[in-house]
Amino acid sequence: MSVYLAEFLGTMLLIILGDGVVANVVLKKSKGHNSGWIVITTGWGLAVAMSVYLVGRISGAHINPAVTIGLAFIGQFPWSKVPGYIFSQILGAFVGAILVYLTYLPHWKETDDPDAKLAVFCTGPAVRKYGANLLTEIIGTMVLLMGVLGIGANKLADGLNPLLVGFLVWSIGLSLGGPTGYAINPARDFGPRLAHAILPIPGKRDSDWSYSWVPIIGPIIGGILGASLYNWLF
């Protein structure tokens, strides 16, 4: 299998399971309605773990442009493959979001809150302060990259590494996710946000493009900083 196809499939699965758990919690008349933040963060952690198990042996399961760019920045990934990886990740996230939309098709009309519908697809700040929101995404992604590199260096637990990465993302969500919803992944936010803009979702609001740069720029900066700091320290 092509590494680019693997990144597409891995990111698609990430969004099916990740955006899917958000849909289950926030859309009305779903079985998981109002089950809360811990369910969402747990679902996202498991989504990451399952995606890494699926394609990790093929492409490394970056499933995140911030990871791809961070690794390239410290010389652990060729820059020539960066554009293809990022395109595959964004496309996978876009398709994954469409599949979530189709899965919950009857529930969009049942849900009155347009913000809840948007939240299924992409992140938004609890308090809109762009500087603080950007800093939150930088810190969260910095922790992600340092953790991923640290887990990857543990050669005694290769079979457990995807699960440990899932626990890492779960922990980031529980601890650092409150201010922005912890995108920590430009593809995870941009691809589904684009799907939200295009899909015929009844009663939807705008796709909040004025905020969309934060979960793109913040994770990229954080990924570079986290990878560089880990590389310097260890």
From Swiss-Prot:
GO terms for biological process: glycerol transmembrane transport. Keywords: Cell membrane, Membrane, Repeat, Transmembrane, Transmembrane helix, Transport. GO terms for cellular component: plasma membrane. The keyword Membrane applies. The chain crosses the membrane at residues 3-23, 36-56, 82-102, 134-154, 164-184, 214-234. Signal peptide: none annotated. Mediates glycerol diffusion across the cytoplasmic membrane via a pore-type mechanism. Belongs to the MIP/aquaporin (TC 1.A.8) family. This is Probable glycerol uptake facilitator protein. The lineage of its organism: Bacteria, Thermotogati, Thermotogota, Thermotogae, Thermotogales. The gene is glpF.
